[in-house]
Amino acid sequence: MHVTTQEIMHKAMHLKPRDGALDLLKWLALLSMVLDHLRYVGFSADWLYVPGRLAFPWFCLAMAANLARERTTTTGGQWRYLGWLLLFSAVSEIPYRMFIPHPDTLNVLPTLALGLLVVRGWQQPALASRLLAAGALLLAGIFSERLMFGFFGVLLPWVMLLVFRRPWYFGLLAGLVCVAANQWQVLYHAARLGNHAAIPAIAACLIAPWLGLFLLRHAKGVNPPPMRRWAYALYPAHFLILLALRQAIA
């Protein structure tokens, strides 16, 4: 098919530039996750649990930022997003179980996939979208103990979308949902017993959404390597790399 220079220029003019702040947020979320998982390599570093509390809310905020863009609210774009999450949910489960000793939950991607369906049901009035969102909430309620971050983890991407364009202090409300997603009863009990990481972990959960929103709004001049679809593979890959490191140390 012949494409004129004028058509190419028209398409180029309508392409949105990449958001460097959003890419930076994704890289920082990945770094926080890796720091958290270093606790399972063999080092005595329970304090890494604290920066690890930033990872999930920042991934949820990145999802909300992507879905807030006009071009990703189309049905096709969001189905592709869901497809990638479901594909790597399956691909990542075996590396996840190889690395994490006796996991009580699935890997984090099923939680994000259900969260995507909830957001999609909120954004689109179509009956199918609303039914899928209701089904996602039902599954999250029934299988909350099997989902990483549970029922509130499924809600967190939607909450992030609600506060995305609101004043900064709404991020602190999202922080309450983040605390609930991180087993607040366990953290509260650990804090009462004097666990040195519990109170900083609660604080990290509370401020994580606000920190992420601050970054997206004020780090516009950064230009980190863009995170594209290949980045999904980093999730199962980091389990295998850390597993190899643990075996090498042992």
Annotate each predicted stretch with a short phrase.
Residues M1-A250:
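Alpha-helical transmembrane segments and their immediate juxtamembrane cytosolic regions
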